[in-house]
Amino acid sequence: MPIKTGRLLRISAAALALTSGAAAAAQSDLTVALQLEPPHLDPTSAAAGAIDSVLYSNVFEGLTRFASDGSIIPGLAKSWEISEDGTSYTFHLNAGVTFHDGTSMDAEDVKFSLDRARGEDSANAQKALFAGITDVSVVDPLTVKVSLEAANGSFLFNMAWGDAVIVAPETIENIKTNPVGTGAFQFSNWVQGDRIELTRNADYWGTPAALESATFKFISDPTAAFAAMMAEDVDAFVNFPAPENLPQFEADPRFQVIVGSTEGETILSTNNKMPPLDNVKVRKAIAHAIDRQAIIDGAMFGIGTPIGTHFAPHHPDYLDLTANSAYDPDLAKQLLAEAGFENGFETTLKLPPPSYARRGGEIIAAQLRAVGIQTEISNLEWAQWLEQVFRGKDYGLTIVSHTEPMDIGIYARPDYYFQYDNPAFQTLMTDLRSQSDPATRSAMLQKAQTIISEDYVNGFLFELAVPTVAN
């Protein structure tokens, strides 16, 4: 199921650059700035793309990984066999792989990692990726067999997620502050509120990193981000938070500006169980009250692509459904009146730190106010957002970019933070997993896109672009 996963924000441009010989030819160290600091350093127990931006592929690796064209290629597993009925996968691991603490990585570690991810007490934010696993058995030290309850055409894809990396049981107790993986870089230091430092893994089993060290610097304020780049305090800023400054960088021969697309569906996430947002007419009214292009222009200075469902526009199975939620404030007012809210209502709008959320939130609040919906805005730090919104579901509206690869399946999870419960959609997603025919899968994915678009589960805003400024 190849997609353009090389464009993922989760597989950050910074992460990819760290092992690039060309990128590092003139220097032995690199300082990359990011706006978001990870809440902790365990990618298997948090829904924070900020963790993967630093650690995925650099420190931690999975059985499979994404190639630059989005296809699935070997990772820690050098090869695999799939049973005729598609219900078992036998992975053959690379020999000589060690964790950064010097211990060997073997089939027992794979079993531990997958069993931990799928266990009843699992804190993995993407636990659904592992739900179909019925057994993980060690065949020999370099061979592991994974049995599934039913064929799953997405299984190898799922194993490439940052949530599916392989960890060692001996180091799991301190993983949130001292992560130990198998990657080309190993964790060195975390000065919270400032930076994370990685150093080259001299014993890496694969192609060695070109850099000796890499530092991820966290700069949340757009003004400070601009100042840091102009002073050349950092070598690159991935997802630069002040797009209004990009023309100035483009005109300066010291810098280059690279704008890439992502898998990041930026949405006005809606609590589907909180009245009156549990009323589809109210959600539809919100959708028609939003001028997406005005948000892209005002918050992102024109960088971004409007969407009408939770699917990346560059995906071959994408269906353009933006007309379903076209800007129409008069229709929004009519729908509110039909739902019994002629005079509008009040709700909360809780915003995480990214600029697209903070800036976009102010614009959306004004657009909703114009049709009678009053929002109480709260600006949250990332850890607060994860606790209150993602885990606690204590919100009415929020804005966030879902950067996981082709993650429309989250709408089949009633316990997910927007609490959408549609049995027909859940059945469709279950049936999709057992399908391998490309045409059939495409039709099912387009049907899924249509269902959530017409149910107005969330306000679908735009596909996040990633502007990177580098020296």
Regions flagged by a language model, labelled:
Residues 37-53, 76-77, 103, 125-126, ...:
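A structural "hinge/loop" feature
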Residues 92, 126-169:
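Surface-exposed binding/hinge segments that line
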Residues 78-123, 139, 145, 276:
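Aromatic- and charge-enriched surface segment that lines or borders ligand/interaction sites
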Residues 27, 191, 289-317, 355-365, ...:
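Detector for C-terminal structural segments
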Residues 173, 201-247, 365, 374-376:
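Ligand-site clamp/hinge motif
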Residues 200, 251, 258, 277-366, ...:
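Append "and occasionally in soluble cytosolic enzymes with long acidic Gly/Pro-rich linkers
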Residues 71, 151, 157-209, 213, ...:
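Gly/Pro-rich hinge or "lid" segments in bacterial periplasmic/extracellular proteins
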Residues 33-84, 115, 180-182:
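N-terminal lobe/hinge region of extracytoplasmic solute-binding protein
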